[in-house]
């Protein structure tokens, strides 16, 4: 039977039965699901019923925020999300990182896509002034129907891993207004 089937279907293979891997890493996703890596989209995981990718379309919303307690998996998820956004298929990404003294995010300090990395609060105001200026410029381009100019703009990602930076931001009405206006 096997010999007849092999002769009948020469050069063909059965489709691989999909499975949920023990750990869903970015390298596994790149190898197994390359067709799902698109600009503005990040694969969040696999649907357990269909073993099909579950996608996050960052372009569909304005600001996307993740918060949580330390040691609860937030950092792992955010680092995965960040690495996925740094893939060429996602589009250009620009990082602004406000780290704390533990320097958990120091791997990105000299990354070519990092605009600002600081583990003090010295650059909090500068970062939000710069990002606000860029966002307002994008709104103006959009209002003037210059959508093509917007396509070349990078994604702006701000990572805040500093309770001191959060306290400074929370106490500054100008920065709060900037965030609300994004």
Describe each PLM feature range.
Residues 1-15:
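Conserved P-loop NTPase
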Residues 21, 29-182:
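P-loop NTPase catalytic phosphate-binding loop
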Residues 11-14, 27-28, 60:
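P-loop NTPase motor module signature
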